[in-house]
């Protein structure tokens, strides 16, 4: 059974009452939050409360951009008369709610037409103008279609052009439009905006794409001069969303062929071309029985489809449209229990019974959000002003402005800028970072995009990924931390993308076998395919896209270091995930290597992506990326003295700048771990939290320490700066940067209130070689042409810059020395230098043993640049901690490393690989195990008696084994763990005392009572812990005595030390010992399901992984690399790695940027 066509009554001109509005608003917000599974959450209830308060106070409220996008898409989804609404999720929404004049409306509509036309590859688009408000005339587009043809009524009643537009054409002529009296004259747009008088605007001919109609078999068809426009844009609908009404919201999809061929050209009340074409075809038009009308109708529709397809303009035939809708309807019934449909409007105007929709039972009902048909003749209701004949842009005599008038003008100018920004395409630039470099690149990209797009920079952690589908243009700039991990503020973003993929698609592609984000990211490195493909020059229409992000265009730039096996892996993961979710890439994935050419890679990528973005959004005359803004302008930065003000607490300042929970720990103790005659220094620092209740960490976690720069370097920099015209270095100041909004300059704070000395000491990085961008700024301050030329060369020539950076690794002081003509105002340097970033160290303590302390094992960095011939450079943090007096406040925060924690089951054995300072996290492991053993076996002393009494029998029977027995006696505190060590001592007895061989069975028998007694007293069974460590020589060994103690106590089952430069021994590395103990390693990892931990620099970790692969291959005959990947995926293979020390490059390099 079909339905009758019901035309919804248009809403009244006045907005809804508060009560009715609140009902609609609550229903809509419930739909919105339910759509991404956040209903009944804190955010949901907060938004409901916020809207309720706004309606009570003002009688209305505003939708967020995400809510507006959701509403517009679902209004199309709910439209009962649209056969093409299966593409509802791909609708592009342009927010024009800040627009205030007809001229601004026209500019927004031109942008809409340009974007939607897309050179023929039509994109479904809607532009939404301000909502209806009490006491304000509506914003309206008076045309029923943005693009339509004029109709001229002649004296004899005949019409030239489109008869449907005769009345509107006459109204345009009355407004002053000059008619051309042709069959296909483009009508002007007539627009009204609130209290403004309506205005008409001619559409630029180059903006409107028209298709000349021709027939594949009738050459004469082209001679008839028929044509039609490519973009069908309905501008007479009202969007009813959340109780708010938007009377002006032009919307387009793309044509179905019959809309042009049957309705527009052949309908008797439109162009009525049936008979002229029938006569051309030689048909008998005198009798209906010849079915000439049907034959003409078919050929006209064939011509329309043929012409559009030949011109590469998007169009769909009515058969495919019918099939597509039936499929959509089936899905909707499964998902929502129904699909409102108007049979009369759904069935195409030809081939009725041959289509599935013709035979489909439909039910017509209304859902909200909704599109509602309005009065199509707004000029009938408009109250024309008596003085409208006066030109709107007429000039008044100039007069002088007073201060108040000038202030109002400034405010008005700022509001115009705000409106201009709101009408632009919005571009969201997401970043994730550990050191701040990704954020700096993101802000630089924003500066490039700002002149054309409405760009914003957002940290991934601050963004709700559920709203990503409502974005139009997305840029991602992210680093990779450690061994292929996301930065801390990018973890949730990564997980949310994976959750979205699993929600919308059961086919996970390269993610199918991944059990965690970490393995997903690592798997992305092995994925080729889309990354290797060239950018598709002729982009596919979004109508053909699939996935929840099919309406999003994106690009990704990854930062990393090729020293790492998972180079820039997180960026690649984001790139692949966005593609998997249906987003359209603008350019291929690009990564910048921290070791070489990162700045150059970013520059090339940013230029390419800017051009691609302008092309994607059809922005004309934007072929070149804007050049960087002049940052050397000292008038745009300033420091202002602050009188009678003390500096704020340093930890609070760092908390505000970095957004971390910074704690003031106290340096309680510092221990030199290496021998006095060692040429290296490694220190153990103990930080006291003085009973802080929020000190919580697990073995394997990290402590991030905010260091201070060397006082000598800071003092020397302050002496070299040009402070003649400014406050002294010890004067408390405000550091500010000028930003422009319209014509109004406003000053915003760049750093917290503090002295210049404090800023250079604790807040700014003065030791890292400056970027090319900073060198460009410094070049503006050089008074010598030679200095200026060299600085400009370094700033523009990436190859010269990289060589200079790697050879000299210069800090700011050395640059001031190298370029003596530099006279830099403190304000400029304070605003250009990057922030001093925290240094991350593995925690070397356990709260089981040290509940109020955090220990860290730190290699003190000290080296000479220029291959050992340059000045001495020191590590910022390690040197500060090495020289700071006991009692110094150390600002720091804790970071969880969940992938490097001990196994939840303590009975599982573990292997720990950590040469040099890589041993740091394993100290927390053995401290944790020692504490657990002590807490688990409170009555072990009683059980030791039975064990101790068995020892004399062995001693008496094997007097020469006496030296081996004490280790057994001393291991009794952890009695269960001593048995393997006791058994391990027996072979040495056998080897040293063959005569004792017969007594060993009695030893083993006498140990059984201990093993029988222990289970009744022991709560847990602990797996063995084996450590592989290494260093250059014995004097470089750290924690030697502690390791021996842990073995004596049975905490460590065993440990092995590799010495690589001991004179009397062959060179040995940890990977060599692993291969040497292949059988034992294989036993623990593969047969006992043990965990394998690696800590240290990246090159060592790579060698250890290769060694483990060799062990697995030799011992088990397995596919080695696949087996290690399987261990990773099962969370049995753990890595906590950092960059190697590269002397030429100036210190430690990490994959984190």
Curated annotation (Swiss-Prot):
11 X 7 AA tandem repeats of E-[NTR]-[ST]-[IM]-[PLQ]-[SP]-[CW]: annotated span: 934-1010
Claim: Ribosomal protein is one of the keywords in the record: no
Regulation: Stimulated by calcium/calmodulin.
Gene Ontology MF annotations: calmodulin binding; flavin adenine dinucleotide binding; FMN binding; heme binding; metal ion binding; NADP binding; nitric-oxide synthase activity
Range of residues in the leader sequence: none
Names of required cofactors: heme b; FAD; FMN
Tissue-by-tissue expression: Expressed in the central nervous system, in the serotonergic cerebral giant cells. The isoform Long and isoform Short are expressed equally in the CNS.
EC number of this enzyme: 1.14.13.39
Enzyme class: oxidoreductase
Gene3D superfamilies: 3.40.50.360, NADPH-cytochrome p450 Reductase, Chain A, domain 3, Nitric Oxide Synthase, Chain A, domain 1, Nitric Oxide Synthase, Chain A, domain 3, Nitric Oxide Synthase,Heme Domain,Chain A domain 2, Nucleotide-binding domain of ferredoxin-NADP reductase (FNR) module, Translation factors
Residues holding NADP(+): 911-929, 1089-1104
Pfam entry (one): NO_synthase
Family matches, as InterPro entries: CysJ-like_FAD-binding (IPR003097), FAD-bd_FR_type (IPR017927), Flavdoxin-like (IPR001094), Flavodoxin/NO_synth (IPR008254), Flavoprot_Pyr_Nucl_cyt_Rdtase (IPR001709), Flavoprotein-like_sf (IPR029039), FNR_nucleotide-bd (IPR039261), NADPH_Cyt_P450_Rdtase_alpha (IPR023173)
Binding-site residues for heme b, renumbered to this chain: 82
Positions of the UniProt region annotated as Calmodulin-binding: 397-417
Reactions performed catalytically: 2 L-arginine + 3 NADPH + 4 O2 + H(+) = 2 L-citrulline + 2 nitric oxide + 3 NADP(+) + 4 H2O
Domain FAD-binding FR-type: 660-903
Classification via SUPFAM superfamilies: Ferredoxin reductase-like, C-terminal NADP-linked domain (SSF52343), Flavoproteins (SSF52218), Nitric oxide (NO) synthase oxygenase domain (SSF56512), Riboflavin synthase domain-like (SSF63380)
Family indicated by similarity: Belongs to the NOS family.
The protein's name in its UniProt record: Nitric oxide synthase
Gene (name only): NOS
């Amino acid at each position: 059974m079909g339905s009758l066509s019901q035309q919804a009554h248009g809403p009244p001109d006045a907005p809804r009452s508060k009560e009715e509005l609140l009902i609609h608003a609550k229903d809509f917000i419930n739909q919105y939050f339910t759509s991404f599974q956040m209903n009944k959450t804190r955010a949901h209830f907060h938004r409901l409360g916020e809207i309720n308060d706004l309606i009570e106070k003002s009688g209305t409220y505003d939708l967020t951009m995400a809510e507006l996008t959701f509403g517009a898409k679902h209004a199309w989804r709910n439209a009962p008369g649209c056969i093409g609404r299966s593409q509802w999720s791909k609708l592009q929404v342009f927010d024009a709610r800040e627009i205030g004049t007809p001229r601004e409306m026209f500019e927004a509509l031109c942008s809409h037409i340009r974007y939607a036309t897309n050179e023929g590859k039509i994109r479904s688009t809607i532009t939404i103008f301000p909502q209806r408000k009490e006491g304000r005339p509506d914003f309206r587009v008076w045309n029923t279609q943005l693009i339509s043809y004029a109709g001229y009524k002649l004296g004899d009643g005949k019409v030239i052009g489109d008869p449907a537009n005769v009345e509107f054409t006459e109204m345009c002529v009355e407004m002053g439009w000059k008619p051309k009296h042709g069959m296909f004259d483009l009508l002007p747009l007539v627009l009204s905006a609130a209290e403004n008088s309506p205005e008409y605007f001619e559409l630029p001919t180059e903006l409107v794409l028209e298709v000349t109609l021709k027939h594949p078999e009738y050459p004469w068809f082209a001679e008839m001069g028929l044509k039609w426009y490519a973009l069908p844009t309905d501008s007479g609908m009202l969007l009813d969303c959340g109780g708010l009404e938007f009377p002006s919201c032009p919307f387009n999809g793309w044509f179905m062929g019959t809309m042009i061929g049957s309705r527009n050209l052949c309908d008797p009340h439109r162009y009525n071309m049936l008979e002229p074409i029938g006569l051309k075809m030689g048909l008998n038009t005198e009798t209906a029985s010849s079915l000439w009308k049907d034959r003409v109708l078919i050929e006209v529709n064939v011509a329309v489809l043929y012409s559009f397809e030949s011109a590469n303009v998007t169009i769909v035939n009515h058969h495919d449209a019918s099939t597509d809708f039936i499929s959509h309807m089936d899905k909707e019934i499964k998902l929502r229990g129904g699909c409102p449909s108007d049979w009369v409007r759904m069935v195409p105007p030809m081939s009725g019974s041959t289509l599935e929709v013709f035979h489909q039972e439909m039910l017509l009902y209304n859902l909200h959000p909704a599109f509602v048909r309005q009065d199509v003749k707004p000029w009938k209701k408009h109250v024309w002003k008596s003085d409208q004949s006066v030109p709107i842009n007429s000039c008044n005599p100039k007069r002088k402005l007073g201060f108040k008038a000038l202030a109002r003008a400034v405010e008005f100018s700022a509001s115009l800028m705000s409106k201009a920004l709101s009408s632009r395409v919005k571009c969201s630039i997401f970043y994730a970072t550990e050191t701040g470099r990704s954020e700096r690149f993101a802000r630089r990209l924003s500066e490039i995009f700002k002149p054309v797009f409405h760009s914003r920079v957002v940290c991934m952690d601050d963004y709700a990924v559920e709203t990503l589908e409502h974005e139009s243009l997305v840029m991602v700039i992210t680093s990779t931390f450690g061994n292929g991990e996301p930065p801390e503020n990018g973890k949730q973003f990564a997980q949310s993308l994976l959750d979205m993929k699993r929600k919308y698609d059961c086919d996970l592609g390269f993610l199918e076998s991944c059990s965690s984000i970490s393995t997903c990211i690592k798997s992305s490195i092995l994925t080729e395919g889309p990354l290797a493909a060239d950018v598709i020059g002729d982009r596919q229409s979004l109508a053909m896209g699939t996935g929840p992000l099919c309406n999003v265009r994106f690009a990704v730039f990854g930062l990393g270091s090729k020293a790492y096996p998972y180079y820039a892996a997180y960026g690649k993961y984001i790139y692949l995930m966005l593609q998997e979710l249906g987003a359209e890439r603008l350019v291929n994935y690009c990564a910048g290597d921290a070791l070489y050419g990162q700045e150059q890679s970013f520059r090339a990528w940013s230029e390419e992506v800017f051009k691609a973005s302008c092309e994607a959004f059809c922005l004309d005359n934007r072929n070149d990326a804007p050049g960087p803004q002049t940052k050397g302008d000292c008038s745009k930065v300033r420091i202002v003295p602050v009188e009678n003000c003390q500096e704020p607490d340093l930890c609070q300042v760092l908390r505000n700048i970095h957004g971390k929970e910074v704690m003031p720990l106290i340096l309680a103790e510092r221990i030199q771990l290496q021998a006095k005659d060692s040429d290296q220094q490694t220190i153990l620092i103990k930080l006291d939290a003085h009973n802080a209740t929020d000190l919580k960490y697990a073995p394997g976690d990290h402590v991030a320490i905010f260091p201070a720069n060397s006082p000598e370097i800071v003092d020397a920099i302050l002496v070299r700066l040009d402070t003649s015209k400014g406050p002294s270095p010890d004067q408390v100041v405000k550091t500010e940067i000028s930003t422009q909004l319209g014509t109004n300059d406003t000053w915003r704070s760049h750093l917290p209130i503090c002295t210049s000395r404090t800023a250079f000491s604790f807040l700014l990085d003065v030791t890292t070689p400056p970027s090319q961008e900073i060198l460009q700024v410094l070049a503006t301050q050089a008074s010598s042409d030679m200095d200026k030329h060299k600085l400009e060369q370094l700033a523009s020539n990436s190859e010269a810059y990289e060589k200079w950076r790697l050879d000299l690794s210069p800090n700011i002081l050395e640059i001031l020395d190298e370029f003596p003509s530099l006279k830099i105002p403190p304000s400029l340097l304070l605003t250009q230098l990057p922030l001093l970033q925290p240094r991350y160290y593995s925690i070397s303590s356990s709260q089981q043993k040290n509940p109020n302390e955090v220990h860290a094992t730190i290699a003190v960095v000290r080296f000479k640049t220029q291959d050992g011939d340059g000045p001495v450079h020191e590590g910022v943090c390690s040197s500060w901690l090495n020289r700071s007096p006991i009692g110094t406040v150390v600002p720091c925060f804790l970071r969880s490393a969940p992938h490097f924690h001990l196994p939840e089951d303590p009975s599982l054995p573990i292997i720990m690989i950590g040469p040099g300072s890589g041993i740091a996290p394993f100290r927390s492991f053995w401290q944790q195990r020692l504490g657990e053993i002590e807490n688990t076996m409170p009555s072990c002393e009683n059980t030791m008696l039975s064990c101790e009494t068995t020892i004399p029998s062995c001693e008496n029977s094997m007097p020469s084994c006496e030296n081996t027995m004490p280790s057994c006696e001393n291991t009794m505190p952890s009695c269960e763990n001593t048995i393997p060590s006791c058994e391990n001592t027996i072979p040495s007895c056998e080897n040293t005392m063959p005569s004792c061989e017969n007594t060993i069975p009695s030893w083993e028998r006498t140990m059984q009572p201990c093993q029988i007694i222990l289970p009744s007293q022991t709560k847990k069974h602990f797996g063995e812990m084996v450590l592989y460590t290494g260093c250059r020589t014995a004097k470089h060994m750290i924690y030697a005595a502690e390791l021996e103690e842990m073995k004596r106590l049975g905490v460590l089952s065993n440990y092995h030390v590799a010495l690589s430069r001991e004179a009397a021994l062959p060179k040995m590395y940890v990977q060599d010992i692993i291969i040497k103990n292949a059988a034992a390693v294989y036993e623990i990892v593969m047969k006992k399901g043990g965990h394998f931990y690696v800590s240290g620099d990246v090159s060592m970790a790579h060698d250890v992984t290769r060694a483990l692969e060799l062990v697995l291959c030799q011992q088990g005959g397995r596919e080695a690399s696949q087996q290690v990947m399987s261990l990773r995926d099962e969370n049995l293979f753990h890595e906590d790695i950092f960059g190697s020390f590269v002397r030429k490059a100036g210190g430690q390099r990490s994959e984190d940027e």
